[in-house]
């Protein structure tokens, strides 16, 4: 539809003109994701005012009060500028907006972008996000309009409480799938983590099962469970969307289930499971075999490590002849090897020895098995410890509605973006501070392109 020049000059970004007789009404609009039609749909936010050839723009309510303005419109037409792009907002910004359409002043993109940049730069709560937005408004306006300034802490709080975490998780996975394509064989660790201060009244603390690439050191996805014991039900759901073809999936004893093992094999992946006493006599049979039957020279590898006045020795034995074990436990037909790791630690003259046992669908050397298992152990230092000590995940008191879950995912987005640009000698917490000080560095982090 062609609009007259006198009406078009009052049209602003994210608005729409609608003809009313010899005048035009101006509405602010946005778009929302429609899950039924699987596309975005236009949504009217609010009536801004009317436009006539004689009087120009008349803001909503002024005509009712008998006031007809003269001069320029109070709604300034922003200059035509090329806004900068980020690699993640295309995937995250089309979230279904659950807020009431009345009085909405900030788009989904503006709130998400403010919160993410704030978290990257060290923000931990709603007030931090608001203060960051006010301080860095000129920087943020390089990416989005922010016609009403930075979102307040109450705006962020209401928005994140209402976001559908399931939809947000899926958009996170879509983004990370484009950001980091895993081509060569590597270890994918699945392990749970609790945010201990996220409880509130009857609402239990948040427990997330995280999927972590041990080589690229990025989070591939996550799944919320009500408590740690429910990891068993969460892992099969994770494996539904996780591409494990050609990779090694490592899971601790909680997830050592033959149904999970079969699911990984069906998806053309391999597994290494830690053994404990949750599978009947399986753990006892493997332990007894290593204690009485194994030759100390058969498929053996030893690794030494010395640092901080601590000497660690790890010995690994792997047995490929496991036909006897699959006959005793017919549900576990996918087992192709068993392993034992002896960890000896010497600290200031005190020596401790620990034994761990594993089952696997791999037929690899002891060295490869040990390296893969150590990759799984690294999830504690490379992910969980960083989330607690650098993002203060364990101390977060965001606890109402869906906000703990959604903010946990947002911290994962920030973690991945920082992980992709940090050097070996940099710490994540130091890099967060530097992003807050140096806008060029922050720009390089959020402009990280898909591979």
Where does each model-flagged region fall?
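An anionic, glycine-rich sequence signature occurring as long contiguous blocks
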Residues: 276-375
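Short, flexible loop/turn motifs enriched in small residues
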Residues: 21-24, 200-207, 351-352, 379
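Dynamic "connector" segments at or just before major functional cores
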Residues: 1-189, 198, 210-222, 236, ...
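Polybasic low-complexity intrinsically disordered regions
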Residues: 178-251, 256-269
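Generic secondary-structure signature for well-ordered alpha-helical cores
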Residues: 165, 240, 291, 295, ...
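Conserved beta-strand -> loop -> alpha-helix junction used to position metal-binding or nucleic-acid-contacting
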Residues: 46-49, 269-285
